[in-house]
Amino acid sequence: MFLKTVMERNQPLVRLGIEWQQNGVILPDTYLLDYDTILENARSIKQAGDANGVQNFFMLKQIGRNPLIARALTDMGYVGAVCVDFREALTMVENQIPLGNVGHLVQIPRAALKKILRAKPVIVTVYTLEKAREISAACTELGLHQKLMLRVLGEGDMLYSGQYGGFELQELDSAVRAIEAMPNVEVGGVCSFPCFLYDEAAQDILPMPNLRTVQTAAEMLRASPLARSSLALTTFRKTSGRTCASTR
């Protein structure tokens, strides 16, 4: 889907790929990554985030969860990796890459839970109280404390097929009450996906109803007497499109 943009902006990479494939240097179905350009784009994004008080995480599922690039990004000052599925999280753990957020699209399976929690992710997304209880039990056994981010749902939210799940706004209060009673975990934020999508007609990235759901949930939690006084609430407003106009 990005081939046209690559051909327009990075012709040397395209020419090199053709040359290497035709000369037998690489096989078909080989991924070529322009390391220098990736890092240049990453610096631009981080500078924009820093200037606006936004913590920067990175996601590498689109480029094969590459640990070499992940290490360069953490050295650059990125907080850690966003691992939307457990295989990506395990790859990062095995390469000593800090974990930012885990479980956003695919919940962490029980069999991988302890290994991932030992890596001390900044925050773990949960869709259900059952998963929160599993994390609580594992953290209690391991002697860890984990922040949880609740995926929230509102009426009219845009959801992709196969990605349903989360806490409806009307049950958020009771869910927070239940989680705050669990040992070794706490509510640390709310999220949804996608909160922004590219609109072909408008030729721009526009907010989805999910964004208002996240804002409402955050307001509810901040106003709730159930939330711990030390809670520094994090809202993740996930986009499904590129949002930094200055990248190459």
Give residue spans per PLM region.
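A general structural detector for well-ordered alpha-helical segments in enzyme core domains, enriched
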Residues: 41, 45, 69, 88, ...
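A generic, well-ordered mixed alpha/beta core segment in the N-terminal half of proteins
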Residues: 101-102, 108-154
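Active-site-proximal loop/turn and secondary-structure-junction residues that shape catalytic pockets
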Residues: 62-64, 85-88, 106-108, 128-131, ...
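Distinct, well-ordered alpha-helical segments
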Residues: 67-73, 93, 112-114, 132-140, ...
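Active-site loop/helix belt of alpha/beta enzymes
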Residues: 154-248
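Hydrophobic faces of well-ordered beta-strands that scaffold small-molecule active sites
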Residues: 31, 56-60, 79-83, 98-104, ...
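Acidic (Asp/Glu)-rich catalytic clusters
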Residues: 45-53, 73-75, 93-96, 114-119, ...
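A charged N-terminal "starter" segment
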Residues: 1-114
